[in-house]
Amino acid sequence: MKLILAIIRIAKMNETKIALSDVGLPSFTVMSVLGRGKGHGDLEKAPFVDPEHLELISEMPRLKSKRMITLVVADDKKDLAVETIIKTNQTSRSGDGKIIVIDTIHSIRVRTGEMGDITLD
């Protein structure tokens, strides 16, 4: 089993939700998160930024609102999940997101006590 964490743009959430469901991965959790990557974005194109303050603003660590999708999949569905998230979210611009894949030892369905891959359906 794999735990997949995907941090994506808010604007891509609905498209990602539909794409994951369309490939048979309808079960996931979504959280609102704040974060930043190494890039500062393209502040020079922002109409509200005073040129006098551009240098100061670009050096400040600003947090951006994103969505974090968490899903647990069987090992044989990891590539499908990752490829679907990439295909849906890749724009080749800074801020497209990040995907982290983590080995998972156990999954337990609380309602029934079932364990293992059967809990992923």
Which residues does each predicted region cover?
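Positively charged, small/polar-rich N-terminal and surface patches that mediate targeting and assembly
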Residues: 1-121
